[in-house]
Amino acid sequence: MPAPHRLYPRSLICLAQALLAWALLAWAPAQASQELTLVGKAAVPDVEIALDGDDWRWLARKRVLTLGVYAPDIPPFDVTYDERYEGLTADYMAIIAHNLGVQAKVLRYPTREQAVGALESGQIDLIGTVNGIEGRLQSLRLSVPYAADHPVLVMPIGARRAPPADLAGQRLAVDANYLPRETLQQAYPQATLHYFPSSEQALAAVAYGQADVFIGDALTTSHLVSQSYFNDVRVVAPAQIVTGGESFGVRADNTRLLRVVNAVLEAIPASERRSLIYRWGLGSSISLDFARPAYSAREQQWMANHPVVKVAVLNLFAPFTLFRTDEQFGGISAAVLQLLQLRTGLDFQIIGVDTVEELIAKLRSGEADMAGALFVNAARESVLSFSRPYVRNGMVIVTRQDPAAPADADHLDGRTIAMVRNSAAIPLLQQRYPQAKVVTADNPTEAMLLVADGQADAVVQTQISASYYVNRYFAGKLRIASALDLPPAEIALATARGQTELISILNKALYSISNDELASIVSRWRGSDGDPRTWYAYRNEIYLLIGLGLLSALLFLSWIVYLRRQIRQRKRAERALNDQLEFMRVLIDGTPNPIYVRDKEGRMLLCNDAYLDTFGVTADAVLGKTIPEANVVGDPALAREMHEFLLTRMSAEREPRFEDRDVTLHGRTRHVYQWTVPYGDSLGELKGIIGGWIDITERAELLRELHDAKESADAANRAKTTFLATMSHEIRTPMNAIIGMLELALLRPADQEPDRQSIQVAYDSARSLLELIGDILDIAKIEAGKFDLAPVRTALRALPEGAIRVFDGLARQKGIELVLKTDIVGVDDVLIDPLRMKQVLSNLVGNAIKFTTEGQVVLTVTARPDGEAAHVQFSVSDTGCGISEADQRQLFKPFSQVGGSAEAGPAPGTGLGLSISRRLVELMGGTLVMRSAPGVGTTVSVDLRLTMVEKSAQATPPAAAAQATPSKPQVSLRVLVVDDHKPNLMLLRQQLDYLGQRVVAADSGEAALALWHEHAFDVVITDCNMPGINGYELARRIRAAEAAPGYGRTRCILFGFTASAQMDEAQRCRAAGMDDCLFKPIGVDALRQRLNEAAARAALPTPPSPQAAAPATHDATPAAFSAESILALTQNDEALIRQLLEELIRTNRADVDQLQKLHQQADWPKVSDMAHRLAGGARVVDAKAMIDTALALEKKAQGQAGPSPEIDGMVRTLAAQSAALETQLRAWLEQRPHQGQP
């Protein structure tokens, strides 16, 4: 045994430690508590209680009873907001304090344990909402129960079966402050317990599939279900636990307090208890008491001065505020405002706004008096005054129905969360999930759309709003994943600061509305129109009901049939004739085609309405009469013929007969399908004939139209075949000359002088081939309806003069006199497309010269004013061989030709010129007429009605403007050239250098744009198809920069440069902001002409012509590989030739390698782009086979989606053609003399 002197100090130390722990335990709750204002029932009842004098004296000294409550709230027992405490427990506490004559004080603690500790330390007198089990575990003395506590089990509405009695295998969700673990494990040992911070979160876990069963007291469960989960869960069974009801708890030694509290509770009548239950929405019905509260004199005066209150609401805040399709205001807030109107007499005028910011601005500016629904938060309370909340609702997480979406709140960190702008929950979310990204939207609908569209991973909303939107608008796309551990959102009315009377009026009116009424309003607006799970949950019952319904219907029908049979048996003799007549009437008159019945003499016995309608007669006109007697066909001879036919039919045949006939009725021929059936009696004796017909005139016409359409389609197919054969002939003819002459030129020794005549033949053939392609494109545009004229002011006299100048040399070569005669009076300038008019005149004059061997060709122009327009006639007459009438009818069809004479043989050309000319003239609103006779000559006249334009000194035809340009100062232009294909870039730069231009080159759109911003350029020529910034985008950016304010340069001329032959390529260039489009390849002369025209349009200095004479060049030389084309493009500059071809060979190698890699990767869009690039390079040397293959590959790859053997072959062919082209080019270079670089 230890010594006494040693035990004494140790005892002191233990005692000191115990006192310190007790002090800390008592101090901690005091520091953590928060004082609340008790808000009980407005009308507190007086009850008779029996207390002795000592108890009353004790209460007089006591003066204050302190009630302890704790977080989280247990609605409807404990409800805290804005430092106020209300609920069922608050109501009873108010009754106790009132009847005991003491003041009630409420302290709120963060946890139940701290509240119990404060009770044990004497800081509070009693604690509320304690059931019997909790009281025994915490050694408390409990008052008599003031509310029943019946634990119930809750499951999702979609659950098909009730849970097993022992909840075996079930996930049981429970409030951590409700029942202790030992009690639950004893009642349900095989269930898996899941504790949650509050009953609301535990119930949400069941609603959203995170738990199977919820257990809670009946009152709290009923309140939460009606407020938030009406369409999600349901009570399925009572729990196997007895708690003893909800009571007040006091310290075990405070018997006096327990006695006086029990005295009050026992004295409260049952009617008052029911009233309190109904007040919190827990009764069986909703109160209809709309009596107005007692308003103060100031409040009544305010309502008298403001009979109309303007209420601002959000347009999209469903289900709280919304506007229906008929513009009617609806939602929870609308229903609350209706109740407030009954309790205040105020008239609420609704003002819809789009955002919360706009709503608050209207409140602060006075445009609105109050807000109909707004979330309560601290930030808004600094500028607004809020009423008592009429909806309190938990926050939930809404995600997509996607396995990758966040499953619950624990998976939100690092995700993108959508929130309504300025939501009070944003700071809390950012604090809890620091790695999450918050994006904001103006309203809940937009926030939901962000998640549905994949721009956010989750949205945080109140459970009511989330359920409303998901069920109505995002079913199958979004889902409510779980509840969020955040303070419940509070929806309240709000006013601007200073509206003291209004906010007081609203609060009083809201307090007069029972929570039962508010719960009913919320229930009407939650959930969707129909739960999609209902069918699957109750399909067996529905099938059973349908089966029972069908069985009942079948029994009912059987009974009806039985009764009708009895009736028919009794009245058969009476109704037999009526039934027969009714049957005949329905059978005959119900048929839409004519039907008749005649006796064996041909008299009409019966006919239907369709028969009478066909002939336009009544039944009296035909019944009992033969066809000649009634004469309904209008032709006596035809009537007799038809009558004889029927008699013969009845006497000769007894079998049904069906046939097609053409009949004429009242002058109209109809094609009918007629049938006749002789009929007899039961003995087989002939009684007459039944007949009718079906009018198949429309069907016959459709068949004829179908036949005609087939003939037309066959003719079109034959025309297509003819076109292809003609095109093959027309293309092969010049190609034969081109290839043959070039082959002979290649076979000549390298040192031998080239045969100029052979080259001239090839050149002429190429020009004819180019004209053929141009004509075909014109025909295609006209037939597609995409051919547009460009009428401009034009000097009328300049049109024929230009045509005469063009063909003067050709006429002299043939020894033909070409004469221009003009008879123009009072007409100067007209509005016309000069290019297309010159095309027409050129075709007509060219044809006249072509078919005239001697004599003359006369172009006559006659013009006279006709009002504001001018009547103009162009006439081309020749002394040629003439054309017969038959040939003239064929001549204006495409590809139609006639020979000029037997000696001349077949005429050269494609036969498209006259066809195009006539169509162009018709597009201009004129006519083209030919008059000719064999041996006399031909005259072709074009008659037009053109708008006259007032003569202007500045009016100059385009051709004259181009010719007048050289008179301007000879100053070179600053030209920016852009092309990612180095051979094309080098060639175009050399051509521009040759023309004396100042050239800056760029090999990409990005580099070109940078150069353009740094330097001023007069002209920009850009390739249309480039990686990165292509030509179209470059043009758009340049034009946008020029249009910007403060841009100080002159607008530059912008040309597109492309190898594409699409008809709409020029239109695409102009749409992008370009002035025009150049097509590869382009010769020096053509390039000079386009620059001259551009300089004239933009009033730029005209580019000078080169000092050294250069050979004529052409835009294209259609041959497989043309040395002449290379010489023309480079102006026979040996150094440039070698530089160009070496760069082309190197670039083609790289492009082919890249093409093969892209082909292996099946990157079809890039394969198409690379094929277009190779086609552009091949055009430099007119490698036609390679161009054709590249263009075919480009087109095929554009729409390709998978592997293609055809593309595989094209890629191999293109690689082989590139290698062959390289071999041929190097061989050609070896044959040429070597020169040094210039």
UniProtKB/Swiss-Prot annotation:
Database matches in SMART domains? HATPase_c, HisKA, HPT, PAS, PBPb, REC
Q: How does it sit in the membrane?
A: Multi-pass membrane protein
Instruction: Name one cellular component (GO) term.
Output: plasma membrane
The HPt domain covers 1133-1228
- How is this chain modified after translation? Activation requires a sequential transfer of a phosphate group from a His in the primary transmitter domain, to an Asp in the receiver domain and to a His in the secondary transmitter domain.
Q: Which residues form the PAC domain?
A: 652-708
Q: What is its EC number?
A: 2.7.13.3
What function is annotated for this protein? Member of the two-component regulatory system BvgS/BvgA. Phosphorylates BvgA via a four-step phosphorelay in response to environmental signals.
What is the name attached to this protein's record?
Virulence sensor protein BvgS
Q: Which organism is it from?
A: Bordetella bronchiseptica (strain ATCC BAA-588 / NCTC 13252 / RB50)
Gene name of the encoded protein:
bvgS
